[in-house]
């Protein structure tokens, strides 16, 4: 055949296929690495090409030097780092048992590690010395799978000896999750004081109420029997009581504790907690470390709204998006107002619902206002506004709430009221430059931006900026699209206008264009449009994403249950978990909810929790609450309801 090729004429030689210039492609085999490892195992099993002998406890283990050097830093330094072992046929390994070394070698060759209660500690010791991180993690995972209240103390000691921070965190998770039962044991009292103090300070402590934290702090110094018989001296406050968030304890328990205490530092602490309870309207501006909810769960929460069926029924439901399950769940919140299209704002994890539409016997604008505290799942009615308002916007600037414009179904408004939680009063500030309703607002860098809306039958593009220090409004660049009954959100130094409707085509239609405003340049740009219409939506910002909840689609002619989520960094929309009902006028925000609310289900797993926590560690500081303007359609266009 070779001779035939040599005698072939140039015109008869195989031609190079004609391919486009610069054509290339890289292929990767999914099986190659496993086949390579299997080949090395075959060499080991056949005793072929061994070039080093490890001497462990006087016994020999033959191996391939190149594989050991590739497997971990310990052997890489030994065989490729210029040490004398590079040229030695036999190498002594000290401080490791022969049986543990055999298991390590099996792992290096096969990726499999056989662990048991009897061998895990010696395997962990060997893995730590040889610096094989995967084996260390497997050992830690195995130990955690067997942790209980009897052995957790020994495992803490083991983690401390080998500086296993991940194991320590996993043990902390076990204690925090089982704190109520574990704090009743003798093992609890044998933990170091600093460790217990750290656990009691944690937001991950699983307790039903702060009363249990107080009891847990005392149980470190006293037995359950002593607590039951009230054989406790609090003249010298135990250090652990500094971790108790007394303002979050039940008022009745605080009062009893105060009454029985003599003059001591603890009585002063309890008195301050009682003052917090008694100044209910001021609680949002009395916040500090000892009033923070014990939770790391930031959740999108929706309040109220109106269903499609039964006919124009107002909702008093509160729903939250469970981040562990990825689905909407009811939030237990008795005495919630039955309203729609309320202004909503969050101040220090207290949510305010301002005015709105009480459509019980025809449209009626509300002046009443409510506040919800997720710490105790309690509603509190604050002072009513001086004017009833529907189709309004609400923002928080500093410690104040601002209710902007709207209408009362007799007149459109331009007046702006400011709520002071220190005095529980409303006062007028500088009015908007024109009457408007069905607009939207958002706060950014200490200023409030109000955009679009409707005046009479005209849809607007106007955008205004309010400076609270000067109490002045200024016009800024016009929005590129007219709209009303839309949402607005601030994210990453920009403001987004989302959803709503207009009549630019001579009839009511959805606005799908999403506009983005930069205060630095005073310019609007259009970004990726909505996948579907959202009039009167709920809007909330969480983890650098904008959630758009339900609302009304004029193109479809009905209310909706779909949820869309916008990721600004990718300029991309994705579907979110659907609501349980078609609903419009839902007021939405982001709240930190108690762990007990989310953990009160037999569906979630520890794996779900860890998947949630990994990204949350990086995003917790960025979680923000942005008020939505989920506004009703005007009376003239309400016939379809």
Swiss-Prot record:
<dbReference type="Pfam" id="PF07707">
    <property type="entry name" value="BACK"/>
</dbReference>
<keyword id="KW-0963">Cytoplasm</keyword>
<dbReference type="GO" id="GO:0005764">
    <property type="term" value="C:lysosome"/>
</dbReference>
<keyword id="KW-0458">Lysosome</keyword>
<feature type="repeat" description="Kelch 4">
    <location>
        <begin position="448"/>
        <end position="493"/>
    </location>
</feature>
<keyword id="KW-0539">Nucleus</keyword>
<dbReference type="GO" id="GO:0006513">
    <property type="term" value="P:protein monoubiquitination"/>
</dbReference>
<keyword id="KW-0833">Ubl conjugation pathway</keyword>
<dbReference type="GO" id="GO:0072686">
    <property type="term" value="C:mitotic spindle"/>
</dbReference>
<keyword id="KW-0206">Cytoskeleton</keyword>
<dbReference type="InterPro" id="IPR011705">
    <property type="entry name" value="BACK"/>
</dbReference>
<dbReference type="GO" id="GO:0005827">
    <property type="term" value="C:polar microtubule"/>
</dbReference>
<dbReference type="GO" id="GO:0005634">
    <property type="term" value="C:nucleus"/>
</dbReference>
<feature type="repeat" description="Kelch 3">
    <location>
        <begin position="400"/>
        <end position="446"/>
    </location>
</feature>
<dbReference type="InterPro" id="IPR017096">
    <property type="entry name" value="BTB-kelch_protein"/>
</dbReference>
<feature type="repeat" description="Kelch 6">
    <location>
        <begin position="545"/>
        <end position="593"/>
    </location>
</feature>
<dbReference type="Pfam" id="PF00651">
    <property type="entry name" value="BTB"/>
</dbReference>
<feature type="domain" description="BTB">
    <location>
        <begin position="50"/>
        <end position="117"/>
    </location>
</feature>
<protein>
    <recommendedName>
        <fullName>Kelch-like protein 22</fullName>
    </recommendedName>
</protein>
<keyword id="KW-0880">Kelch repeat</keyword>
<keyword id="KW-0131">Cell cycle</keyword>
<comment type="subunit">
    <text>Component of the BCR(KLHL22) E3 ubiquitin ligase complex, at least composed of cul3, klhl22 and rbx1.</text>
</comment>
<feature type="repeat" description="Kelch 1">
    <location>
        <begin position="299"/>
        <end position="349"/>
    </location>
</feature>
<dbReference type="GO" id="GO:0005829">
    <property type="term" value="C:cytosol"/>
</dbReference>
<feature type="repeat" description="Kelch 5">
    <location>
        <begin position="494"/>
        <end position="544"/>
    </location>
</feature>
<comment type="function">
    <text>Substrate-specific adapter of a BCR (BTB-CUL3-RBX1) E3 ubiquitin ligase complex. The BCR(KLHL22) ubiquitin ligase complex could mediate the monoubiquitination of PLK1 and regulate its activity in spindle assembly checkpoint (SAC) and chromosome segregation. The BCR(KLHL22) ubiquitin ligase complex may also be responsible for the ubiquitin-dependent proteasomal degradation of DEPDC5 and the activation of the TORC1 pathway.</text>
</comment>
<keyword id="KW-0132">Cell division</keyword>
<comment type="pathway">
    <text>Protein modification; protein ubiquitination.</text>
</comment>
<dbReference type="GO" id="GO:0005813">
    <property type="term" value="C:centrosome"/>
</dbReference>
<dbReference type="Pfam" id="PF24681">
    <property type="entry name" value="Kelch_KLHDC2_KLHL20_DRC7"/>
</dbReference>
<feature type="repeat" description="Kelch 2">
    <location>
        <begin position="350"/>
        <end position="399"/>
    </location>
</feature>
<dbReference type="GO" id="GO:0005737">
    <property type="term" value="C:cytoplasm"/>
</dbReference>
<dbReference type="InterPro" id="IPR030575">
    <property type="entry name" value="KLHL22_BACK"/>
</dbReference>
<dbReference type="GO" id="GO:0031463">
    <property type="term" value="C:Cul3-RING ubiquitin ligase complex"/>
</dbReference>
<dbReference type="InterPro" id="IPR006652">
    <property type="entry name" value="Kelch_1"/>
</dbReference>
<keyword id="KW-0498">Mitosis</keyword>
<dbReference type="InterPro" id="IPR015915">
    <property type="entry name" value="Kelch-typ_b-propeller"/>
</dbReference>
<dbReference type="GO" id="GO:0000070">
    <property type="term" value="P:mitotic sister chromatid segregation"/>
</dbReference>
<dbReference type="GO" id="GO:0051301">
    <property type="term" value="P:cell division"/>
</dbReference>
<keyword id="KW-0677">Repeat</keyword>
<dbReference type="GO" id="GO:0007094">
    <property type="term" value="P:mitotic spindle assembly checkpoint signaling"/>
</dbReference>
<feature type="region of interest" description="Disordered">
    <location>
        <begin position="1"/>
        <end position="25"/>
    </location>
</feature>
